[in-house]
Amino acid sequence: VRAKLGFCGSFPGSLRSGTKEMGPSMRQMSLVRPVKAVALLALLALAACVQPTLSPSSSNQSLPKADTNYYVATTDAGFAIPALPVEEIPETYRRQVVAFESNEPAGTIIINPKTKLLYYVLGDNKAIRYGVGVGRAGFEWSGEAIVADRKPWPTWTPPAEMIARDPAKYSKFAGGQPGGLTNPLGARAIYLTSGGKDYGYRIHGSPEWRSIGKNASSGCIRMINQDVIDLYSRLKGGEKVVVLTASGEMPKGLYIPKT
C-alpha cells in the first residue's frame, strides 16, 4: 500500500431492467456433455486455463431509455436542486437497472473507474447502475472499503494538502464550507474507510454534473446529486465497497497512490 490522502475533506463526527453485464467476481462456468475419453480430457485441460471474469462487461443489447423523471428539479432539505438537461447526459451514465452477474451480496457497491460506472448490487443478478466521475491521473485508487458514515448536505473541509497546493482558492474554507448547492460534496456524502483507516475518499454528489463520465476528481467518486440521493437512501452503513483497478480488474489489495 502506498500512502496518499484523498482530497474530499475531513471525516465527520420504478426502475427498468437493462443490459446484461458481468460482475467482477462471477466465475465462468461451462457444461460438458459426455464425449469420448480423450476429448473429455482435452476439454477439461482447456477449462483449467479459463480465468474468472474480472470486470463488468456489456453485452450487445441496446440500453433502455432511462426515466427522465430522475433528473427533474427537486427540493431537498430546503435546497432547490435544479433539473438537468437529460439529453446532455450520455445514456450510459443515466441511472437504470441492469442485469449484472456477481457473487457479491445484495447491498455491495462495485465501482469500475475504467467505464465510469457504479453498481449497487440488488441480488438476483441485477444491479442499479449510475454514472460517476473518478480520480484523475495520479489520484486513482483501488481496493475494498466499507461505508463508515453518511451525511446529507455535508460540510466540506479541504485537507491541508489541498490548501497548500492552492491557498488562494481553498484557504477561505479551512474552517469548513457549509452544505449547499455549491459545496463540492453536493447533496450527500458517503464516507469510506479501509482496514479501519480513513484515507479521505468519499462517494458524493457534485454541482459539477458535467464531470460525470470523466477522470476529474482527487480520488473521490462523484455522482449527480439526484443519483447520490437515491444511492444514499438505500444504504444503512457497513456496506462493502469494491473499487476496481484503473483497467477494470479486480483489485489484489488496497492501492493508495503516493503523495
Where are these regions (language model features)?
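N-terminal secretory signal peptides that target proteins for export/translocation
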Residues: 1-33
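N-terminal pre-domains immediately preceding structured catalytic cores
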Residues: 23-221, 225-259
